[in-house]
Amino acid sequence: MQFSTVASIAAIAAVASAASNITTATVTEESTTLVTITSCEDHVCSETVSPALVSTATVTVNDVITQYTTWCPLPTTEAPKNTTSPAPTEKPTEKPTEKPTQQGSSTQTVTSYTGAAVKALPAAGALLAGAAALLL
């Protein structure tokens, strides 16, 4: 009888310590910078400068610290360019053809994932210890 009481107390302590081994810290600091975006089409490349949101995530797994930094371009809008040209002196003989252009999407997605195993493994060990204690 005393052994099962001691085992139950050990299982409760294991559950409590498993919960305390999980540490989550969040630090938020908004920062923007300028990034150069290179776009290539038909063997011709062009560069544009865009403001971007900087995001840094630090992940520690088995005492190995890895830092991930991402730069997400922010959508910008440009005012329409005003161009004027002199009136033609002669009527053109051919009608100019127009080629429609496609606009790219300016939506950025940032996702974050915390491995479930990091949170579940200590609790699973404590659960097994508790189940073993109840069987004794």
Swiss-Prot record:
| Keyword Ribonucleoprotein listed | no
Region (Disordered) location: 73-110
Main localization of the protein described in the UniProt heading: secreted
Lipid attachment points (GPI-anchor amidated glycine) = 115
Which residues are part of the propeptide segment? Answer: 116-136
List the residue ranges forming a coiled coil, or say none.
none
According to the record, which residues are glycosylated? 21, 82
Topology within the bilayer:
Lipid-anchor; GPI-anchor
User: Where in the sequence is the signal peptide annotated?
Assistant: 1-18
- List UniProt keywords, sorted A-Z: Cell wall, Glycoprotein, GPI-anchor, Lipoprotein, Membrane, Secreted, Signal
Chain intervals with Low complexity compositional bias: 99-110
GO CC, sorted alphabetically, is: extracellular region; fungal-type cell wall; side of membrane
Q: What's noted about post-translational modification?
A: The GPI-anchor is attached to the protein in the endoplasmic reticulum and serves to target the protein to the cell surface. There, the glucosamine-inositol phospholipid moiety is cleaved off and the GPI-modified mannoprotein is covalently attached via its lipidless GPI glycan remnant to the 1,6-beta-glucan of the outer cell wall layer.
Q: Name one Pfam family in it.
A: Flocculin_t3
Subcellular location, record wording? Secreted, Cell wall; Membrane
Family, per entry:
Belongs to the PGA59 family.
The record describes the protein's role as:
Cell wall protein necessary for cell wall integrity.
Designated name of the protein: Putative covalently bound cell wall protein 22
Source organism per entry reads Saccharomyces cerevisiae (strain ATCC 204508 / S288c) (Baker's yeast)
Q: Which gene encodes it?
A: CCW22
